[in-house]
Amino acid sequence: MKIVVTGAAGFIGSNLVKGLNARGIDDIIAVDDLTQGDKFRNLADLRIADYMDAGDFYDRFAEGAFGHVEAVFHEGACSDTMEPDGKYMMANNYTLSCNLFRACQNQNTRLLYASSAATYGGSDTFSESPEFEKPLNVYGYSKLLFDQHMRRELGMRFENAQTQVAGFRYFNVYGPREQHKGRMASVAFHQFNQFQADGKVKLFGDYGGYGPGGQMRDFVFIDDVVAVNLWFFDHPEKSGIFNLGTGRAQPFNDVAIAVVNTLRQSQNAAPLSLEDAVRGGMIDYVGFPEALVGKYQSYTQADLGALRAAGCQHVFADVQSGVTAYMQWLSNAKN
């Protein structure tokens, strides 16, 4: 069974390869752009059949150069929500995805692709329906445009799909193998490094009607993202657009105190309440950056109705358990 993973050296892509390997699947073509060379580390401990540069792959795949491919996990994209170059964003996230979809349809290959919660943008309702889709940046728009293209081709719920097409609106994903992402890495990753360097972590202060560190997101652990992708891989009859979050909004303060207490525990120090951590100078609230005003989601919470209706009953980790596991992984990786 041949599988393609695009963005395979990236955060979610490499974890998908890891998840497939855990099932004994290694006939995997890993597709990426290794201009940022240190991303190779995400593939170094994994088993793949071949690697191909993204610049070469898409045309060759469309020509049928790889024989029958069972499924493409399409994670390759520009995921920088602050990227200002709209032409670059649309070429990478929209046009390329449209071409890949056509090639998959022509070859009877299943397509499981990364959409994004950024498609909702300024909405206060996070349900897979057009009236709630209000992107705040060109990244979110590029993802929404491809979802809209799929709806035109396959029907609103992809009910006309002859071969599986499933899009996943990832919420705030965090976990191992994101170290290459720079400013786009999760808050938990940055706070790990901040605490190691300075003994404190940083959060935004008041913004959007929320108090310091009170902005709320649906934080989802990478292992859960992989598990849901693989559930759909196991259920080829299921197509559509699905939110992939926990269904729980939690404040950034929850992430911060989980980081602080897990790292304190590794130093044999007692856990602290949020108030005590703030009082002790371990959580530092900073002014909200002007560049993000009007482009920032202060609240997200996935509506899991469509996911559950499809039959996926996966139980998601909360911030406390997921961030704790991640901090332990980062500590072990550093040592």
Swiss-Prot record:
Catalytic activity: ADP-D-glycero-beta-D-manno-heptose = ADP-L-glycero-beta-D-manno-heptose
Cofactor note: Binds 1 NADP(+) per subunit.
Top class in the EC scheme: isomerase
GO biological process annotation, one example: ADP-L-glycero-beta-D-manno-heptose biosynthetic process
Keywords tagged on the record: Carbohydrate metabolism, Isomerase, NADP
Database matches in InterPro entries: Epimerase_deHydtase (IPR001509), Heptose_epim (IPR011912), NAD(P)-bd_dom_sf (IPR036291)
Binding positions for substrate per the UniProt entry: 172, 183, 190, 204-207, 217, 296
Keyword Transcription regulation among record annotations: no
Swiss-Prot/TrEMBL cofactor(s): NADP(+)
Sequence positions that bind NADP(+): 11-12, 32-33, 39, 75-79, 92, 143, 173, 181
Active site, per annotation: 139, 181
SUPFAM superfamilies in the cross-refs: NAD(P)-binding Rossmann-fold domains
Gene3D superfamilies tied to this protein: NAD(P)-binding Rossmann-like Domain (3.40.50.720), UDP-galactose 4-epimerase, domain 1 (3.90.25.10)
EC number: 5.1.3.20
Pfam families: Epimerase (PF01370)
Biological or metabolic pathway of the protein: Nucleotide-sugar biosynthesis; ADP-L-glycero-beta-D-manno-heptose biosynthesis; ADP-L-glycero-beta-D-manno-heptose from D-glycero-beta-D-manno-heptose 7-phosphate: step 4/4
GO molecular function: ADP-glyceromanno-heptose 6-epimerase activity; NADP binding
Domain topic, free-text comment: Contains a large N-terminal NADP-binding domain, and a smaller C-terminal substrate-binding domain.
Function text: Catalyzes the interconversion between ADP-D-glycero-beta-D-manno-heptose and ADP-L-glycero-beta-D-manno-heptose via an epimerization at carbon 6 of the heptose.
Family under the similarity heading: Belongs to the NAD(P)-dependent epimerase/dehydratase family. HldD subfamily.
Assembly with partners or alone: Homopentamer.
Protein name (Swiss-Prot/TrEMBL): ADP-L-glycero-D-manno-heptose-6-epimerase
Source organism of the structure: Polaromonas naphthalenivorans (strain CJ2)
Gene: hldD
